[in-house]
Amino acid sequence: LGTLGFLLAAPSRAQEAGPRWCRLGTTPAVSGYEQQLVEEIRSQLGGLPAKTDNMGNLLVTIGSGSPQRLIVTPLDEPGYVVSGITPDGYLRVQRLPQAAPNAVFDLLHAAQPVTISTRKGQQVSGVVAGLSVHLQPARLNGPKMAHPDEMYVDIGASSREEVRAAGVDLLDPISLNSQAHPLANSQLTAPAVGDRFGCIALVNFLNNLERNKAQVSGTLTVAFITEQWAGGRGLDRILHEVTADEMIYVGRLAPPRASPNAAPATPVSVPTAFKPGEGILLGVSDEAAPLGDYAAELQSAADAANVKIHAELAATPRIGGYAAQTPFPKKFAYLGVPILFPVTPAETLSMADVGSITDLLYRYLVGTKSLTGARGSIVSGGSAAPILETLTEAYGASGHEEAVRKVVSEFLPHGAKTETDASGDLILRLGTAAGGSAKKIVFVAHMDEIGYQVHSVEPDGRLLVDVLGGGYTEYFLGHAVLVHKADGTREAGVLELPAGWDKPGFEWPHGPRNMDDPVHVYLGTRSAEETQKLGIKVGDWITIPKKYHPLYGTRANARSFDDRVGCTALLEAVKSLGLSLPGRDVTFVWSTEEEVGLKGAAAVAEKMAKDGHPADFVFAIDTFVSSDSPLESQRFADAEIGKGFVVRAIDNSNIAPREYVDRVVQLARDNGIPVQFGVTGGGNDGAVFTRYGAVDIPLSWPLRYAHSAAEVIDTRDVDALSKIVTVLAKNW
């Protein structure tokens, strides 16, 4: 696997106890704002001498005399900077670099969690706003979310003052909330990993030098440079600071220029026939020409280190600006690695290739084999999370709700007598009036979330998948996924992007869809046999990774608040009610497969009717998809987060009688519970009870950016929802 083959345990940015290499790969470092990553590198260099210039470049110099050798790698990733703050607390952004790296760069940030790095070194969580798919059939000419003019970042604030109270201000950089995921065959997917593999390789190289007390001939300077995406300014400075006889640049191979007089290429990875794991790429200006003397020296060192190296057509690293191009040393080499899905949230490379760069450099500069590091590990911990956080972070796509059902059962009061029906619904009946004259009341919240399911395994090892639920493909393709296997373990993969995504002028077909176009998942495997060896089978299910992020004040972000908030509200209500409700007939249902046709709730409704116990009233506890967003028209679905629960009077599946809407509103006001009511899109579980005589009165909480990784709630609305369920269970 090479020196870095062990680097495959991958926690998120927030897990500071994670492997050292992972912190190098996931620490935010938007162009011009690389200071945090520089400090992380410095902390990993031990006693090696390191200095930082006023461009932010970090230099480590070892030895003295001639020859003067320079090894360079970039630090920065493309991202955004806060360019404005709206009166209602949203952040406006400017892209860095100002020209988009590819046609889908902005779009792939839509409805995604992000991190804002403040002046005081805080990492503030936020999300990029996205359209809610449930509302779009009733909209006209919605935004495409494909340009900074249509981008807003939501940190949970309601005003400029709250934004600044959170520590966020103009010029603060914004980057994706990164998480690295190991794939098969030593591959890794993570945002910006194509900008960081050089940092990982060179820090490991320097640590190997120090551990081995190795000597290099002459003077060696290793430079970690800033602003590769902003015209190569850090590189330009280094070339004036260090007079080098020879230079090796480790980073993305830039595409060849269209002509000798064309502008320097941006550092987007070159298309290559080589795949991750097949070796190092050596950038050349003419693939057909014999290697020059310096490249031949590196080829010889690669052979001695048993490292594969392939010539690949590429331009020299970019240096922009208005002055003449700074010349590179005559002895110059450009090293990269094959990268899939470059400059997307799911770009993928092989850590074995990264390790090979360390091995090659060590062999070339020291003359011996490098020291292989020890295996890394994930450090996990933390106290038990509250109900909502625990439920939200449990995975359970439609038809695969076992883990969620287990969490619900564990949070129910001791002694709760539940049953699980053939559809997987969890049912709890309370009260002493079953079969009597009391009105039969049902509260139902669904446990499932949207996702995918393995349809078949392709001969090349990729998965062809079916959709479970609906949403915007823009929020999922080009991002990492988790494949949940029958034995309870997971494998990471990447949802592949549409054909042509990396071509100039590509435009994603816009509009709400049920994601039913053919979609593939890349796992890093090379054949169906390799995929089968991972234990993946037809029928295994797939989700986007997720994590609960507190935002400003009482707001929070996570995927699958729809409908884990509803599940939480029912649990909180049961805790408040206790397990005895004299004179009442109340059933609580945590249902399955709502996202694929209300199937679990339909099974419960049918069984109750067949047993002669049909519901009189059903309160479906589910999302009110809200237009409380700068991207949405407020013509309908206008319920503000933080202003209370919502009576979902009208949606696509039900119209609640006004007399009952008004009655719920009055009960809420009588009990001091903040309440709203309105019209939204989507369907609800209660709709399948109406055929058996029930009245459906859906109760909700307002949700921003539904069916995405950017979902945002106000936890005060969850409290209001659980309180109204408690009141209704006692008094309806």
Regions found by a protein language model. Name each.
Residues 5-732:
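N-terminal hydrophobic/helix-forming segments and targeting peptides
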